[in-house]
């Protein structure tokens, strides 16, 4: 991640929202450059670390929270759960998300694992921790990303605009007290991981439920269709 001002790295609305943690973002950039200098790589690639914040802040209607990026080289792209279009086979969690997507909405299975269309339509795909060492899950937890992503979520709730948070798993559920401060409704279920998907993720219908809640709040629904 290059040493550049925050307003050159993210969308203008997000630059304002993240201003309280601008120094922390800069410190995380220093941390990542130190990792590279020490011969330790990180994922996703530098230009994608803040990718979730390159889509319009004011247009976010749904928040989907992940834990940290995929640790498999070639998978992480800076949007939670998403992968590059050429990744095959899909990560198991994403395959389970698509199984529920098809069952919930009746759409055919997507042709690839790229969730960019959701990000472009007002879905913030945000990991709590924005980087990871390759093949070392959770290796950057506690290194300093959590205050940044918490600030982002607090900024969303402070808008007092309709927001639906889709919280998959226990880690994501810890955000409920923050989300309760705004005009936000949370949908909770177990994580789509193979370890927990059969314990309540399948059949939870998060996509149609999110749209129903948005409509009840007077907001436009999300077009969840993927190519």
From Swiss-Prot:
Keywords: Cytoplasm, DNA damage, DNA repair, Hydrolase. InterPro entries: UDG_fam1, Ura-DNA_Glyclase_AS, Uracil-DNA_glycosylase-like, Uracil-DNA_glycosylase-like_sf. This is Uracil-DNA glycosylase. The gene is ung. It comes from the Bacteria. Its main location: cytoplasm. It catalyses: Hydrolyzes single-stranded DNA or mismatched double-stranded DNA and polynucleotides, releasing free uracil. The active site is at residue 68. One of its GO terms (molecular function) is uracil DNA N-glycosylase activity. CDD domains: UDG-F1-like (cd10027). The keyword Hydrolase applies. Belongs to the uracil-DNA glycosylase (UDG) superfamily. UNG family. Excises uracil residues from the DNA which can arise as a result of misincorporation of dUMP residues by DNA polymerase or due to deamination of cytosine.
